[in-house]
Amino acid sequence: MGVFTFEDEINSPVAPATLYKALVTDADNVIPKALDSFKSVENVEGNGGPGTIKKITFLEDGETKFVLHKIESIDEANLGYSYSVVGGAALPDTAEKITFDSKLVAGPNGGSAGKLTVKYETKGDAEPNQDELKTGKAKADALFKAIEAYLLAHPDYN
């Protein structure tokens, strides 16, 4: 098994606590509202805390797909969150799991700065496919921007 690590940063005009709530604690409600392609988020194992596995169902290219998302840790006090993709359409055949560790901090003008570390664990000696990585990043960025747009369009959310 190989482990490949990538880091990314993103800025948002939305305050850290509001963004964290939408991305983590209220994500099951916000994501389907922010993106029509997301149909449902359901717990298939656990109570919402670490160890919980969620099934996220969405439409892509006219097809219903899902992803299994395992919560690794939640650090509300420090606006940190870690989860792994452990199955479904977002997990390439070459990957054992893909873990996302994120943390939000105060950014410029009352907004947020997000720091993300991605750990891509491959099966055997496989290496991540660069095209799949680019596609995955583009989808993650689009999800983030859709949630950000939802929050900006709903200033009373909190």
Curated annotation (Swiss-Prot):
Claim: Hydrolase is one of the keywords in the record: no
One Pfam assignment: Bet_v_1
Induction comment from the UniProt entry of this chain: Induced by salicylate, methyl viologen, chitosan, hydrogen peroxide and sodium phosphate.
Domain of life: Eukaryota
Keywords noted in UniProt: Allergen, Pathogenesis-related protein, Plant defense
One GO cellular component term noted in the UniProt record for this chain: cytoplasm
Molecular function per GO: abscisic acid binding; protein phosphatase inhibitor activity; signaling receptor activity
Tissue-specific expression: Expressed in hypocotyls and leaves.
Alphabetized PROSITE patterns for the sequence: PATHOGENESIS_BETVI
Gene Ontology terms: biological process: abscisic acid-activated signaling pathway; defense response
PANTHER family per the UniProt record, alphabetical: OS08G0374000 PROTEIN-RELATED, STRESS-INDUCED PROTEIN SAM22
Family statement drawn from the similarity comment of this UniProt entry: Belongs to the BetVI family.
Task performed by this protein: Involved in disease resistance.
Protein name: Stress-induced protein SAM22
Organism: Glycine max
Highest classification ranks of the organism: Eukaryota, Viridiplantae, Streptophyta, Embryophyta, Tracheophyta
Annotated gene: PR-10
